[in-house]
UniProtKB/Swiss-Prot annotation:
Belongs to the universal ribosomal protein uS9 family. Residues 114-132 have a biased composition (Basic residues). This is Small ribosomal subunit protein uS9. Residues 100-132 are annotated as: Disordered. HAMAP family: Ribosomal_uS9_B. One of its GO terms (molecular function) is structural constituent of ribosome. GO terms for biological process: translation. Keywords: Ribonucleoprotein, Ribosomal protein. PROSITE patterns: RIBOSOMAL_S9. The gene is rpsI. Coiled coil: none annotated. It comes from the Bacteria. It comes from Dehalococcoides mccartyi (strain ATCC BAA-2100 / JCM 16839 / KCTC 5957 / BAV1). One of its GO terms (cellular component) is cytosolic small ribosomal subunit.
């Protein structure tokens, strides 16, 4: 499927997190910022989000991934990694694109924090209204 020394790069984004994913053929080892996935993301929900593109395309255990992730929190980072893995998988085989697209894994989730407006306490919270 893929030559020994070839690798595929995918950049994923979610909230303020940016993840650079380098996929190469291997046995399924995923290293995030120099640590194994189990050590970096302890909650199973985040790991499921990260591994979802591989589960959907049935490529689990066929690729090794080296991932660098910057910014954001745990949720943003796991979403960014999943987006990056999906983009890298798309480059490995064009046939996977339809599967990834139908599962919404190639679409960038553009939901970000809403900015604070002047005159309000937060994005939408107004100060208490006094009648008199």
């Amino acid at each position: 499927m893929v030559e020994k020394n070839t690798y595929f790069i995918g950049v994923g984004r979610r909230k303020t997190a940016v993840a650079t994913v380098k996929l190469m053929s291997g046995n399924g080892v995923i290293v995030i910022d120099g640590k194994p996935i189990e050590e970096r993301f302890t909650r199973i929900q985040e790991r499921n989000v990260i591994l979802n593109p591989m589960m959907v395309t049935d490529t689990m255990g066929k690729f090794n991934a080296v991932i660098k992730v910057l910014g954001g929190g745990v949720t943003g980072q796991s979403g960014a990694i999943a987006h990056g893995i999906a983009r890298a998988l798309e480059k490995t085989d064009e046939k996977l694109r339809a599967t990834l697209k139908s599962n919404g894994l190639l679409t960038r989730d553009d939901r970000t924090k809403e900015r604070k407006k002047p005159g309000l306490k937060r994005a939408r919270k107004a100060p208490q209204y006094t009648k008199r």
